Amino acid sequence: RYSSSAASDVYKRQTLDLLVLLPIIFWAARLTRNWIISWRGFEHEDFRYIDLKNTNRLNAEFRNFFGIHLFPTLIVNFCLYPLIFIFSNNATVTPFLYLASLFTFMSVVLETVADEQMRDFRKDPMNKGKTMKYKLWKYSRHPNYLGEIGFWFGIYFMGISSGLAPMWIILCPLSMLALFVFASCPMMDNRSLENRSDYKEYMEKTSQLLLLPPKN
């Protein structure tokens, strides 16, 4: 009886680990693939660093360290905090965990599909300087960001499925949502407004994040 009970516990533990880790591994693999595909060599410099050069040196170094590197890193680590509760010894596999794992996985699918659609659009030389406003991008200006936000809410959902997490950890995914809504999305919108003449009209008609029908 003891052996059977121990085997059952091991199976439940392995099931829990798989439900939590598979969407995270998928998410990490997507990021790694994106980096490999988009890497242009050591001489390439991200536009954010180029923009920083237009400010004074002290301000540039401050924004580089805190704004581009430290703060987002802290947010990511903070948003991973709910996993502590799902990996505790008292956590069990629940139907809600299955749903949360599926939600997390599908969020990564959403951003992966959005990335591929944008990549295919940019491959066509005829689209240079034009705005992508087809497929998922017809309904959201940043469907890839929507998927990323969904991923972090999925981490939160998996954490609370344990029944052990405090209520305040809702702040974890909300902090990531705020980062995208008030920083990442506006930054990309402003850059697109500067570089694409048709982006203003697209921006006025298209939802920032949620997949919604375009405005008339």
Where are these regions (language model features)?
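Membrane-proximal soluble regions of multi-pass membrane proteins
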Residues: 34-43, 127-134, 191-216
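Transmembrane alpha-helical segments that form the membrane-embedded catalytic/substrate-channel core
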Residues: 25-43, 73-78, 101-122, 172-192
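Single conserved hydrophobic/aromatic residue that forms the stacking wall/gate
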Residues: 1-11
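Juxtamembrane helix-capping/reentrant segments at transmembrane boundaries
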Residues: 8, 44-67, 130-137
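Interfacial segments of alpha-helical transmembrane regions
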Residues: 18-25, 93-105
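Core segments of transmembrane alpha-helices
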Residues: 67-81, 144-156
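Solvent-exposed interhelical
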Residues: 126-149
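C-terminal transmembrane module of eukaryotic multi-pass membrane proteins
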Residues: 164-195, 200-207, 211
